[in-house]
């Protein structure tokens, strides 16, 4: 099974360096031809490890994507909305209480939300009494404001994670996208000013369950790592690889579109923006098995042809075509010139269409120009037909090409996920079933003495009170003066009573009562 796999992946991997799957390999450079004996013929070694000179194989661990198609990476979270319910009461002179209820919003703090979620983790989600109006208190001639701050948490709220830039996608975000959760920013803004979205687990990498650990063999030459043989025995070359992070995990995107995370000392550049990785589903794996079977068949055909050559001691152009190297890289090229078996060093490249190597009638393009033929013979079984057309034996079989085209059409890139509008709440679901309300202590604020009047009323009342007070003062002053006036008259009469005398009608002098008393007393 290992040789089969080693045939498949170099062919696919190195062909993808050119962006497409190959149908043929053609030398770009041909060394000088030299005659050889028939026993020097051999089937090509399609192990790319030897081509790169990396013959040192050592076991190591690496991380790769899981087998199977990944449609979307779901991240569970919740939305949190801050609601302030306020009750305002006023009690007038006679004790009549007027109550006004108000509801406002506030932007919740992420730290408070996580603490509340942890406290209420074991409880069933429901709408609690805190959504109702708070029980108001009252004081005579005062305004009392009683407020309740509630955190309304709606869970679950599912979003899609983009593995390339760790951005989140959902219809609850502005523009349906959140730039991602970082150390400094643990939440995402939503379309509501007072509602934020937060993941259940801050580390988004734990939600990205698309990796698996594997064991393989590292192919190296000194300190340089050329590639590795994966857990299934497939060789992966690091030539042309670039660095790419998936879900925040650094790794390498290989030229065949696969992604691996492994330690290497090679200097590798970052992938350009928008670079994607390929995933294969089970259908693609089945097609790969078809390609493997076809390549194994070609390997067996090469061995059969070589056995036939050594047994019969005869060589034909058709048999030489089986000795062609199937993957890009260094190898051998064979031909027959003037009944002499010839060999040359060659470096092969992949070919996508026949027009690349046969641009016109009678022209076989090698190294940018038409390769000369010797009496109608080129190399690797390629000859010039009687009508002047170039004939390639592999052009007669299209089965491998059909399999490769199927495989190419089945390559699935891991695209940026699109938020499904039905992932948050499906039709018929009741949001109340997912609501948790977390209520801190009730806040109560008592104002000073308040008469319950508007500003102009307070001024009128103050003016009237001042006028009444002034009138009351004037009244009191007036009353006090009236009380003091009789007392002053009596005092003046008492002070002059000893000097008063009365003259009777007879002309006699009648002294005052005091004089009369004193005189009478003395007379007696």
From Swiss-Prot:
Virion surface-facing ranges: 20-459
Keywords per UniProt: Disulfide bond, Glycoprotein, Lipoprotein, Membrane, Palmitate, Signal, Transmembrane, Transmembrane helix, Viral envelope protein, Virion
InterPro entries: PH_Rhabdo_glycop, Rhabdo_glycop_CD, Rhabdo_glycop_FD
Record field: transmembrane: 460-480
BP term (GO), one: entry receptor-mediated virion attachment to host cell
Ranges of Polar residues composition bias in the record: 489-507
Keyword Ion transport included in the entry's annotation: no
Glycosylation sites per record: 56, 266, 338
Domain of life (superkingdom): Viruses
Disulfide bond annotation, renumbered to this chain: 43-302, 54-226, 178-188, 208-247, 242-271, 363-370
A GO CC term assigned to this protein in UniProt: virion membrane
SUPFAM superfamilies xref list: Viral glycoprotein ectodomain-like (SSF161008)
Chief site of localization: virion
Pfam families: PH_Rhabdo_glycop, Rhabdo_glycop_CD, Rhabdo_glycop_FD
Family, similarity comment: Belongs to the lyssavirus glycoprotein family.
Assembly notes: Homotrimer. Interacts with matrix protein. Interacts with host TRFC. Interacts with host BST2; this interaction inhibits viral budding by tethering new virions to the cell surface. Interacts with ITGB1. Interacts with host GRM2.
Protein name: Glycoprotein
Organism name: Rabies virus (strain China/DRV)
This protein's encoding gene: G
